[in-house]
Amino acid sequence: MAVAQCPASCGELIQGWIMGSEKLVSCPVDWYSTVEVSTGSPLADERPLSRAMVNQLLAHWDYPAHLSQDIRVSIHSTIPIAKGMASSTADIAATAVATAHHLGHELNETTLAQLCVSLEPTDSTVFQQLTLFDHNDASTQIPCHSQPALDLLVLESPQTLRTADYHRIPRQAGLQAGAPALKRAWEKVQEACAQQNPYRMGEAATLSAIASQMLLPKPDFDALLSLVEECDLYGVNVAHSGSVVGLMLDRQRHDVEYVKWLLTRKKLTEHWPEQHLLRMVSGGVQPQ
């Protein structure tokens, strides 16, 4: 049996029109999809995209297609689905690496990214480093070589939106309008990583979140911004094609219980009734 795990993402640190196309930098957090691949018949309730990934890998290495019927994929994940937390990328990327190991192969990050985008738009959680990524065709992969330490209070909404449905929304005009802000946001991400500066990362994410309001507005967004200001948090990041929001902070320095109390007082918990305190971590799929 081969096992691999891939982290979820709290939305994106930034996403928008950068250098001529829509690109993103995911925000990997310590919540994982773990996938076991073993010899056996496929499970009845398996996820179609994971099976599609198995079939792609068999073709990639010139195995006969019928071998798929002897490969069992078991996914263990509590990552919320269709909320902007990269649950699908985590499942299919971990499936890819576990299947590769099961077949006796290694997968580098670039090949993994290309395999994933051929199935669906993909989050940059597949890379160990924070990476500016063209999530539609994998043509751009620009890594940041370090990242600041920070925590996220992830605000989970009951609202769901499939990534494919988001991509059907006409958004070209909004993307173009946000391009100057996204240029600045990407510069700030690079500075934040070079300087290990969480405040600079918060500025980058907040710029992108504000630009995203033109495309997929979050409710009571101004109240979220005022809470960030009031508590001197690093910033706010959002799922640009989902409903989650992240309050960027340091659990040692900021009073998380007070932040939660304020969320209730400002009635923001009506939109985001569940909260999860998570760490931003390195991305990448790890064999277990």
Give, region by region, the residue ranges found by the protein language model.
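ATP-binding N-lobe of GHMP and related small-molecule kinases
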Residues: M1-K83
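DPxDG-like acidic metal-binding loop motif
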Residues: K83-E109, T125
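Active-site catalytic microenvironments for nucleophilic, acid-base chemistry
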Residues: Q56, H60, A98-H105, S118
